[in-house]
């Protein structure tokens, strides 16, 4: 049970990166990467599923996010154990972690998709235990969203692809203090209609307040929830 809670919390923090931070950007043009991200944030804030789907390739984001997180956990398992020696999840070797993440890939992705479904449909009633877990996840997404904001650097555009460095930071509350500052990069592609669509969110262990900042936040989240 505990390992499932921890896995869900990792996914929860990842989902927060999709749209849990709100801010207002100066660029109001509709056909720029920055404007696309602003529309995503607005969709999350207003729980507008149609607008969200217009600017987010959900399958691409979630599958790439799982792949990226899996790779980061495998490649940095020794450093993670040294950083958080009390966490059983980091006491395994890279071979175990690789196999573990591969075995649970479908479960993780299904959980993330269902949590998003509940987020955008507050009238949906949980029926199964899986539904209940997803509903809990969507409620936690709202809790995070209420206490985080973001800003971003100008987009770097190469042909029909763009990357945008975003800084996410919390307020002075229990949830907000979990992550004082974290950096992620949003990747978008330009569709045939000229609009940009989010396809990937990644973070870098080499960047200050990158990957490790989110892991540290997850560890603080365990404590906040009383899971330790």
Pin down the residues of each PLM region.
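Short, Lys/Arg-rich N-terminal segment immediately upstream of the first membrane anchor
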Residues: 1-5
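Alpha-helical transmembrane segments of integral membrane proteins
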Residues: 6-10
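Alpha-helical protein-protein interaction elements
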Residues: 14-17, 92, 111, 128, ...
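Short, low-complexity N-terminal intrinsically disordered segments enriched in polar/charged residues
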Residues: 11-99, 103
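Alpha-helical structural elements
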Residues: 17-20, 95, 114, 131, ...
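Low-complexity, intrinsically disordered terminal/linker segments enriched in charged
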Residues: 134-228
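Surface-exposed, charged secondary-structure patches
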Residues: 74-177
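Residue-identity detector for threonine
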Residues: 23, 30-32, 46, 54, ...
